[in-house]
Amino acid sequence: MNEKQEFKPYIAPEKVTPELTVTSIIMGVLLAVVFGAANAYLGLRVGMTVSASIPAAVISMGVIRVIMKKNSILESNLVQTIGSAGESLAAGAIFTLPALFLWAAEGKMDKPSILEITVIALIGGLLGVLFMVPLRNALIVREHGVLPYPEGTACAEVLLAGEEGGANASTVFAGLGIAGAFKFIIDGLKLVPSEINIRVKGYAGEIGTQIYPAVMSVGYICGPRISSYMFAGGIISWLVLIPAIVLFGSDLTLYPGTAPIGEMFASGGASAIWGSYIRYIGAGALAAGGIISLIKSLPLIVRTFRDALKSMNGTKEGGNVRTNQDLNMKIILVAIAILTILVWLLPQIPVSLLGAVIVVIFGFFFATVSSRMVGLVGSSNNPVSGMAIATLLIATIILKATGDSGIHGMQGAIAIGSIICIVAAIAGDTSQDLKTGYLLGATPKKQQIGEIIGVIAAGLAISGVLYLLDSAWGFGTEQLGAPQAMLMKMIIEGVMNNNLPWALVFIGVFLAIAAEVVGIPVLPFAIGVYLPVQLNACIMVGGLIRLGFEKSKKEKKDKERMISDGMLYCSGMIAGEGIIGILLAVFAVFKIDEVIDLSGKLNLSEPVATIGSLVVFALIILLVLKFSFWKKKKESK
């Protein structure tokens, strides 16, 4: 305990420096919207999002220190606090809310209103922050030195290395601009195809790769291990399952297909089989993966909840000094009560008082679990999808048992699941950000206000983003697979209507169990089973680039800086492609995409088009090397 009391942050508690300023709010809100939109687009495409804390911190340091000539590390910390909330809220929203759009596309309900999406996102985000605030002293202060908080600590280190902020910010902006340009060339002007495919005559499987910079960046950031698991899942689906389905079921019409499998393959190729059958196998694998990860985490979850509640009963350390000031507890309790009443009474959230009670109970439980688990194992290993699956199963069973079935009950279940998923994601992000602030000497109260500002900004933007993407391409398509949302939809329909192709679902479940038995992390493997193999292959390329960096013969310090530069550049590429992806969605809604499409005018033959795609992909890879591997090589001369 003495060691904890003697901890000295970078900025002393008695020193007051700018934090929550007009500059930090404006920059933070902009980054919250940008990274929220970019991660919404990315998550719907590849089934995962990437943390915005470090790129937001680097951008803020670059702008505040280099452009504005100010030296305020706590101001930069507030920027990343506000900005990272956008990514976390987007992650929680896209894993669940697209299910409402999918039901609307099937004619089961009207499309959800912008107000409905906004209300759910805002309530979930605000509850996530408010539930976490009382836990700060227990998790951040009392367990300092016990909980490592990987991302929170790394973000603090980036901010402390502020003198490098300008150069690092330029790396992020370079990735943003370059990826945006390539995205516009590939999907806007359509000068080259977005995929390179290889097919073998007489064999129903196919392999290939997409050439998108953001997808490749996901592989680099996740690393070779996770990338290889996803690629393995894609190989199982596209080179084993699809050929087997076509070979043994060619003359059969199997539900949910409506034509003989042979005819489906002849007219639509492997993609038709993927759309009718593989998605259900992938969803079964994802469900099993989420449940397995939750079961494996149960001892830790129980211990986490128990320890957090015990710690909350302890004496608050630090008195009323600046670095230990939280939002007033009375205000927090009143706000939680008001939000609970809104969940019950607002027509945009179709749940009863029972549903509101479920939200509060599960919300506080999973907020507590998420807040501590990110401290133990990091945000990347926080089983948010497993928490959402557990909540959905229990909520759907309760709603059906109490007579709230049909589409109304399904809407209520997804609303509850969405709020809980967002609560868990935001609580984890808040916990990481408060750890960063604790190390730097930030004022917790100002950070908590910053989190609320970020939640409001991203919550107001996410509904528009979802509407745009649905109008442009639709969810559950090859363009936007939305694997988690498809899974949540499947779970609710399975409980309410019992009309799923259970044989396909259980094939996926047993694939996931087999992966777990041989020691393969189930969730990345399951996402790989669900997603197109071309997307998985592109992710694998990014993972191989990272592997090459890790295996290089450079000195340890140079290797770490090189890998870090690559991470920043790839973070920028994800943001850049996401921004242009949203812009192209706007173009598609207003039919501008047809005007700028040059593919028909060029009329390239398939071999020439493939060569063009290979050249573009090679350029994307070379530019990653330029801003990481070769950048440090030049500096060392």
What is each model feature region?
Residues 1-637:
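Alpha-helical multipass membrane-protein architecture
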